Amino acid sequence: MSIIYALIAREDTQSGYGENIHVLVEQSLDAVGNFPQITRQEILKKVPKNDRSLYKYKEKYVYHTINEDSFTYLCLTDASFPKRTAMTFLEEIKKSFNEKYSFDERIKAITFKMNDSFGGILGNKMKYYNQNSLDPRLARIKNEAQATLGIMEGNLDSVNERGEKLELLVKS
């Protein structure tokens, strides 16, 4: 369960839709395969304008996308990765990217212009979400189960101590 690959791309608004797309920053974590090429040559051209979408790829992977104002925020995940978590990841990188760069900087950027300045941020966010990828509801249930386990262990320790005291009483 992980985010394998992510990118931020900009469509050249002067040309026709999907004809001239610039990948401004991309990052992959332990990805084996030609995901970057497939994404740039095929997937980016299919992303609908001003929409959120999912694309299954070979039943093992899912592309998650957000397209707003000529920018596409995309990540590729294992099929088992929670969809809500992937979209939260995309919203967070969109927010960080928009805070770091002015609209003018973003709209004038050339291909891979922001790899050096934003690639590390993108990679760190991918690592964070890969380590904390549980659906928020599952994470809450897991925390509650751990708290319950701690209480039960404390109760068992108390019972064991009382058992020893009872044993001493019976012997005397």
Question: Can you annotate each of these PLM segments?
Answer:
Residues M1-E161, E167-L168:
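Soluble N-terminal interaction domains of secretory/endomembrane membrane proteins
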